[in-house]
Swiss-Prot record:
Localisation per UniProt entry: Cell inner membrane
Gene that encodes it: kdpA
Transmembrane intervals: 5-25, 63-83, 132-152, 170-190, 253-273, 283-303, 329-349, 356-376, 379-399, 416-436, 484-504, 526-546
Description of how the protein assembles with itself and partners: The system is composed of three essential subunits: KdpA, KdpB and KdpC.
Organism: Escherichia coli O6:H1 (strain CFT073 / ATCC 700928 / UPEC)
Protein name per its UniProtKB record: Potassium-transporting ATPase potassium-binding subunit
Membrane topology category: Multi-pass membrane protein
Major site of localization recorded for this protein: membrane
Family named by the database record: Belongs to the KdpA family.
């Protein structure tokens, strides 16, 4: 079993790196504001038709464009969900959503979280899924990538005030990266058996002779961008464990690759744009080491079996409860780590049914900010915050002003870095405390004791870090939970983007200093270890008390 797990992880990472390298080169061209071959004419026509100016923006203008687009998208999606019974492509005549569920869902998809307090096949029309959720899957992913584009430019430009043009970046990212790759993935899913139609739900007679209603819909087109954009919201309630979304072992492997593809490519692009590919490889090494260790822990925990069943004398050599039986415990464990290391949240196994340690690792990966590959754009700019913190700590140890890529890291950058890093832990801990202090929060818990607290902690961690997966034992479709999680999702997304853009605005105006004998190399194994240690230290100091009350207490009981 250990050899199979190692082979699975190694194969996954090898294929991922092979696919991400050329995509990274394409992204580097976009960051450097070089149009891709054959796209100049199309861009000129589109920019003219849309009235888009290619004039560069400072960080405040860039940020305003990103925020304005997302707030407008939130309002449109909110009212679309409220009035979906008036809109077309609703063959099941599904009613509009309640205000709190519509708000939660709109915030969820605009922030790239895709937390779902509803069952897709019984709640949303085809129009809402297509024109509402799928559109936001593209826009939220493009917004995250645009932010990291601006931050990378801040490190590589000198004595400037501009970071590019947000509208140009958003259009290029959507047209030349997300749309074509998602189209290829969608066509592959259709070929493998995923649904893509507009038929009404089909009544069929099962083998036992009973009647069953099978949901239909344009699934493959949403499934592709759901994974590629690290969105994660399923067309159906079972998410990627539903055979209409994820029909074969091959589509399952492609889904995992799609989740990590752009985050990995962005690391390659960063090294290329910075003029030192070792910088990108350093980030990939740090992410990969944490990823492999976490995957190994989850696989080991699930292969050991369920201790509670063993105590009752039942055969539980492997914990298959809640796992995707088509793919097995190892693939289910790998998928769980992939989806929580990134900000995806799609699932093929019920994380609530994992063992205490097996469920703690995905929760912890979210709590550290999903910086292990992470979401499209958000993962890399989250990791860059830890890079700045690691550089600052190293500067304190050697008594020099910290610098990264020749840019000196001053008090302003460190204050903004600390603010950005503290946003999500504050939301998680305060949100979990509020839920446990109120009847409305506690009443949603299915299980008592440590596991019940783990359900609450996981939900708030997922929302604040824009993941969207859940310990499904929590009944979250209530006004209290819909509003609490909507607040966590919104602040967790834009409360980090705002200081990141402010950091970019500060760095882009600085000159790059040549490296000296006292400069800390940021591309070698020493800095990789320092960066990993910084991530682990911040995660340990922040969340060990909360984890001790939940999964650790459950494991020891």
């Amino acid at each position: 079993m250990a050899a199979q797990g190692f082979l699975l992880i190694a194969t996954f990472l090898l294929v991922l790196m092979v696919l991400a390298r050329p995509l990274g080169s394409g992204l580097a061209r976009l960051i450097n504001d070089i149009p891709l071959p054959g796209t100049t004419g199309v861009e000129r026509v589109l920019f003219s038709a849309l009235g888009v100016s290619d004039r560069e923006m400072n960080w405040k203008q860039y940020l305003s464009a990103i925020l304005g687009l997302n707030i407008l998208g939130l309002a449109v999606l909110f009212f679309m969900l409220l009035g979906q019974h008036y809109l077309p492509l609703n063959p099941q005549q599904l009613p509009g959503l309640s205000w709190d569920l519509a708000l939660n869902t709109a915030v969820s998809f605009v922030t790239n979280t895709n937390w779902q307090s509803y069952s897709g096949e019984t709640t949303l029309s085809y129009f809402s899924q297509m024109a509402g959720l799928t559109v936001q899957n593209f826009l939220s992913a493009a917004s995250g990538i645009a932010v990291i584009f601006a931050l990378i430019r801040a490190f590589t430009r000198q004595s400037m005030s501009t970071l590019g043009n947000a509208w140009v970046d958003l259009l290029r990212i959507t047209l030349w990266v997300l749309a074509p790759v998602a189209l290829l993935i969608a066509l592959f899913f259709i070929q493998q058996g995923a649904l893509q139609n507009f038929l009404p739900y089909q009544a069929v007679t099962t083998i036992e002779g009973s009647q069953q209603l099978l949901p239909m819909g344009p699934v493959a087109s949403q499934e592709a961008i759901k994974m590629l954009g690290t969105n994660g919201g399923g067309f159906f309630n079972a998410n990627s464990s539903h055979p209409f979304e994820n029909p074969t072992a091959l589509t399952n492997f492609v889904q995992m690759l799609a989740i990590f593809l752009i985050p990995t490519a962005l690391c390659f692009a960063f090294g290329e744009v910075a003029g030192d590919r070792r910088q990108g490889r350093m980030l990939l090494w740090a992410m990969s080491v944490i990823f492999v260790i976490c995957t190994g822990v989850v696989m080991w925990a699930e292969v050991q079996g369920n201790p509670h069943l063993l105590a009752l004398g039942a055969d539980s050599s492997i914990n298959m409860e809640g796992k995707e039986s088509r793919f097995g415990v190892l693939v289910s464990s790998l998928f769980a780590v992939v989806t929580t290391a990134a900000s995806c949240g799609a699932v093929i196994a019920m994380h609530d049914s994992f063992t205490a340690l097996g469920g703690m690792v995905p929760m912890w990966l979210m709590q550290i900010g999903e910086v292990v590959f992470g979401g499209v754009g958000s993962g890399l700019y989250g990791m860059m915050l830890f890079v700045l913190l690691a550089v600052f700590i190293a500067g304190l140890m050697i008594g020099r002003t910290p610098e990264y890529l020749g840019k000196k890291i001053d008090v302003r950058e460190m204050k903004l870095t600390a603010l950005a890093i503290l946003v999500t832990p504050t939301l998680v801990l305060m949100g979990a405390a509020l839920a446990m202090m109120t009847d409305a929060g506690r009443s949603a818990m299915l299980n008592p004791g440590p596991h019940g607290f783990s359900e609450v902690l996981y939900a708030v961690s997922s929302a604040a870090n824009n993941n969207g997966s859940a310990f499904a034992g929590l009944s979250a479709n209530s006004p209290f939970w819909n509003c609490l999680l909507a607040l966590c999702m919104f602040v967790g997304r834009f409360g980090v983007i705002i200081p990141v853009m402010a950091i970019a605005g500060s760095l882009v105006s600085k000159k790059s200093q040549p490296a000296s004998s006292g400069t800390l190399p940021t591309h070698g194994p020493l800095f990789v270890g320092l960066l990993i240690g910084t991530v682990l230290l911040v995660g340990a100091l922040t969340f060990i008390p909360a984890l001790a009350l939940g999964p650790v207490a459950e494991y020891l009981s």
